[in-house]
Amino acid sequence: MKKDIAVFGAGAAGMFVALAAQARGLSVALFEPHARTPNNFAISGGLFPAAGSRFQRASGIDDSPQAWLDDLRAFAPGMVNERIAQSVAEALPLATDFLVDGCAAPFRFLPDMIAPGHNRRRFHSIEPASGAAMHAWFRQAVQAQPAIAWFEALPQVRRQSRGFAVDGAQDVLEVDQLVLAGGGFGANAQMVERFIPGMAGALNNGSVTNDGSAMALGLQWGAQVWGMDGYQGQGHTNPGGATRLGMAIPSLGGILVNRQGQRFVAEDIGPSALAPRVLSQPGGVALEVFDAAIEAQLGNHWAYQQALAAGQVMSAGSVHELAAQAGVDAQALAQTLEQVAACSGGQIDPLGRRAFARSLSAPLKASWVTGALSHTQGGLLTDADGRVLLEDGQIMTGVFAAGGCAAGLSGRGADGYLPGNGLAQAFGLGWCLAQALG
């Protein structure tokens, strides 16, 4: 059996590339050995930036790919993967148009979504806004395309003088080009200990399918890697990892306190950078404190609604009642909220937080959170079109990569992850990659 390309991994990048490639008239074999297990795409927030999209313009938002790049470079100075950043920024509005116009994706702009590090509102998603809903739409879309053959098998591949032989279907497939689109290595304890020792043993709230296998195939062929210590942390994860609060609460005025009832971090540094800070506190936990007025703005936030339904959110009519429920020092918590009120009125925050949306008032809300590893940012280094690069900088013939197994947009540690980077790389680099195939 002959196909033009084989794609390993049916996450965001893999399914996007498959759709974009078939739209160019290419035949695709899409392999997903973990089809019955939720991948990172399915458990993500399902949010991606598309700076300069027509949907933003229709909402009166003045944005551009360059503005998003400026935000990325300011948020992660010296940590941006400049090989792909410009092309990804320019590709994201095109990728969004393709999904909506070419695939009838029910995507929409989220004018109320505020994210740390972004100076404009530029997030897009599906209705309802969740990774589960977006993943389900993509799965249905790829399986409806006759040019995309779907295989729930672990493929074995060998290089040939021209192209590749892929064994994972009923017959051995002959393909011209290979796209590695598997997950990262967040569920591979040995790789985490080697490359991100500070998160060794931390809660992994990413998919168990992130075993590093797609990356290993590229390494076997001499691929170069980049940013292997970079990762997306999640500082709003409820202990146990089944639910999380989402990233919006600090932007709306929420705070984090430790078991002593004291703030310990500027909460607006972003959800990723918060993860190691939360883990550094006693017990590796923090209490996220907000109020009913903030909760009222989270009706469309899927992650928060899941946590609320799971009983992870406390409600209290006063500071002392909340302190009693949470088991923190009431006097310290009251003093903390007084300090927050002063900062929201213009006083400089000693921890360096730049903005407090408002002071908090009863009825109060709170939830215990911990720091977790959501997904890794390092991976196979590519050029701007997703071609995998060898250790000497030359292009690896016929091999492309995008998604979790490929080098991300920015890294070192958790601080370089700008919210939305994961799906931005998957769709933006995926678009460039698909145009380069053939």
Predicted feature descriptions by range:
Residues 2-3, 169-177:
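Core beta-strand elements of the Rossmann-like FAD/NAD(P) dinucleotide-binding domain
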Residues 4-30:
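N-terminal Rossmann-like FAD-binding beta1-loop-alpha1 element of flavoenzymes
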Residues 19, 24, 31, 304-306, ...:
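C-terminal structured subdomain/cap of oxidoreductase catalytic cores
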Residues 33-153, 256-257, 263:
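Conserved N-terminal/central alpha/beta ligand/cofactor-binding core
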Residues 151-163:
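A conserved short coil-to-beta-strand element within the FAD-binding core of flavoproteins
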Residues 177-237, 423, 429-432:
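Glycine-rich loop(s) and the adjacent beta-strand/alpha-helix scaffold that form part
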Residues 215-217, 221-332:
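An anion/pyrophosphate-binding glycine-rich loop and adjacent beta-alpha core
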Residues 332-413:
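A glycine-rich dinucleotide-binding beta-alpha-beta segment and adjacent secondary-structure elements
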